[in-house]
């Protein structure tokens, strides 16, 4: 195969890339957002990820102020660990929930069922700009919609693809 799609998480992907290298198998590898973090796998030869393409809504190397502020604060709290898209997704969803609750005037006196109904209503009509995308919105089933983004690993760093 010329291209191998790996819709798996980064730990397992690192094992596959290591084994492929060991047996001399050199296709182009492509992964999803679960691959974000492959460069941080302990003991993994990150040079094996060179040329790997993956979908991820977050790039810790992005130069915008919001991303750099988040990365700086995250690294300070997490002993220098660089955040991946999972951390950025978590950050975005916390603020999306906060914004939805604020817009709805949630007081804290609502039952869990009432709060769920309120949030469903808010998320059906709101749009969010965050670290992992702009104009993010949710459909009636709660599925998020945001523009896809891809990076390729070059010289050990993520490089956004046009």
Task: Please place each PLM-identified region on the residue numbering.
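Extracytosolic ligand-binding ectodomains
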Residues: 1-162
């Amino acid at each position: 195969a010329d291209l191998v799609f790996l819709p798996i998480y980064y730990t397992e992907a690192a094992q596959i890339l290591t084994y492929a290298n060991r047996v001399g198998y050199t296709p182009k590898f492509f992964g999803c957002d679960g691959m974000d973090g492959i460069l941080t796998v302990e003991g993994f030869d990150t040079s094996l990820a060179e040329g790997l393409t993956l979908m991820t809504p977050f790039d810790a190397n992005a130069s915008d102020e919001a991303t750099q502020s988040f990365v700086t604060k995250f690294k300070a709290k997490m002993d220098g660990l660089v955040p991946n898209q999972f951390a950025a997704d978590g950050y975005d969803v916390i603020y999306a929930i906060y914004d939805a609750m604020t817009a709805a005037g949630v007081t804290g006196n609502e039952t869990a069922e009432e709060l769920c109904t309120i949030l469903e209503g808010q998320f059906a009509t709101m749009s969010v700009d965050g670290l992992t995308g702009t104009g993010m919105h949710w459909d009636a089933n709660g599925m998020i919609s945001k523009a896809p983004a891809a990076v390729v690993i070059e010289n050990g760093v993520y490089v956004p693809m046009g």
